[in-house]
Amino acid sequence: MYRGRFAPTPSGPLHLGSLVAAVGSYLDAKAHRGEWLVRIEDVDKPRAVPGAADTILTQLEAHGLEWDGSVLYQSQRDSVYQHQLNQLENAQRLYQCDCSRRAIRARSDHYDGYCRNRQPRSTPYALRFINNNPVDTFNDRAHGLLEDHSASVSEDFVLKRRDGLYAYQLAVVVDDIEQGITDIVRGSDLITPSFWQLTLWQYFTGKQPRMMHLPLIMNDDGLKLSKQNHAPSIESSQARNNLFTALDYLGIKPESELRHSPVSEILQQALQSWCKKWHIAGR
């Protein structure tokens, strides 16, 4: 059974770019008669803004994006991530690294495995995954075959940070596997970390989820629309207009008379268009 998810970081309310990812992942799940889960990716606790998670959920509801099951919060799952690290340590797939970013940059444009065969001389330290079998190619439903044979893809990447926080790469894969995610639909800015994540998927399960990376929305300066670049939040009171704009970026144009219809009707027509666009049968 198809199971997808939308996994925002609660560093602020949803903006148009994150709405595009939410709508795309929602439509794809419903087109496949699957489930659409919501996960709050607050593993990076200092980035989480108080109240932002609740605001995001309210915004999703206002736009007719109803999720299946209960919402998962990464900030409540430290013991799960630590257990997985313990398993990796027992399998001798981790090592300690006390290299600073400055030290790494001074040696190379990627992490060179400097600490793999030595004990760190000081604390704190990060934990790196011994990346013996990197995944450097995968098929993307929107982009076709994607390849990255650069040294950064095959480097030993961090699973627990020097500040003691669990790395996003670990948390997202552990959660996806535990939740039974079969399909990941998200923005194209996450293509690069996909290679590390698929490496972990392959190590943990021997298989990979289907991937689909959606187009990004750029601002007037040519930068990705994001909270970091001060993208304005969407207004729930403008849900119909927001959906029309998001769907336009996804290559879907609902009939203009639907601008005054309930959001459920807009999404229903968008669902039919999504099936046609991506050649999904059965709707």
UniProtKB/Swiss-Prot annotation:
Co-factor requirement: Zn(2+)
Designated name of the protein: Glutamyl-Q tRNA(Asp) synthetase
Residues bound to Zn(2+): 97, 99, 111, 115
Cellular component aspect of the GO annotation: cytosol
Keyword entries, A-Z: Aminoacyl-tRNA synthetase, ATP-binding, Ligase, Metal-binding, Nucleotide-binding, Zinc
SUPFAM superfamilies according to UniProt: Nucleotidylyl transferase
Gene Ontology BP, a term: glutamyl-tRNA aminoacylation
EC numbers for this chain: 6.1.1.-
HAMAP family: Glu_Q_tRNA_synth
Disulfide-bond pairs as recorded: none
Signal peptide span: none
Family of the protein in this entry: Belongs to the class-I aminoacyl-tRNA synthetase family. GluQ subfamily.
Organism of derivation: Idiomarina loihiensis (strain ATCC BAA-735 / DSM 15497 / L2-TR)
The protein's role, per its UniProt record: Catalyzes the tRNA-independent activation of glutamate in presence of ATP and the subsequent transfer of glutamate onto a tRNA(Asp). Glutamate is transferred on the 2-amino-5-(4,5-dihydroxy-2-cyclopenten-1-yl) moiety of the queuosine in the wobble position of the QUC anticodon.
Motif, 'KMSKS' region: chain positions: 224-228
Cofactor info, note text: Binds 1 zinc ion per subunit.
Taxonomic lineage from the root: Bacteria, Pseudomonadati, Pseudomonadota, Gammaproteobacteria, Alteromonadales
Binding positions (L-glutamate): 5-9, 41, 168, 186
A molecular-function term among this protein's GO annotations: ATP binding
